[in-house]
Amino acid sequence: MNLILTLLINTLLSSVLVLIAFWLPQLNIYTEKSSPYECGFDPMVSARLPFSMKFFLVAITFLLFDLEIALLLPLPWASQTTNLKTMLTMALILISLLAASLAYEWTQKGLEWTE
């Protein structure tokens, strides 16, 4: 009963906070807040610089590979367990997934900076 009550209160509280976060910014809509400010003058150039999509994709790829490698770090301690076959199977699956994703990135030309 306590678990259900706690989950219900947490769900209700988080839903209320999300709804408040969506409704409050819509009450104060000012065009001045969304425009670039340059000392009261009209802007000389656009303040919205284009972002390189290639850089973004390389950064996301780095984060994914970094997380997968972080999963490999506990393997030396896991090798001391009694169930060595399961540990080796999981390590092989993880390394295979890492190699397959690297091969996919390579074939899709995701690792080449210049086009």
From Swiss-Prot:
One annotated GO biological process: mitochondrial electron transport, NADH to ubiquinone
Keywords recorded for this protein, A-Z: Electron transport, Membrane, Mitochondrion, Mitochondrion inner membrane, NAD, Respiratory chain, Translocase, Transmembrane, Transmembrane helix, Transport, Ubiquinone
Disulfide bridge partners, by residue number: none
Bilayer-crossing regions: 3-23, 55-75, 86-106
Pfam families membership: Oxidored_q4
Subcellular localization(s) per the UniProt record: Mitochondrion inner membrane
Annotated membrane topology: Multi-pass membrane protein
Known EC number: 7.1.1.2
Top class in the EC scheme: translocase
Reaction catalysed by this enzyme: a ubiquinone + NADH + 5 H(+)(in) = a ubiquinol + NAD(+) + 4 H(+)(out)
Entry's family note: Belongs to the complex I subunit 3 family.
Protein's job: Core subunit of the mitochondrial membrane respiratory chain NADH dehydrogenase (Complex I) which catalyzes electron transfer from NADH through the respiratory chain, using ubiquinone as an electron acceptor. Essential for the catalytic activity of complex I.
The protein, known as: NADH-ubiquinone oxidoreductase chain 3
Organism: Rhinoceros unicornis
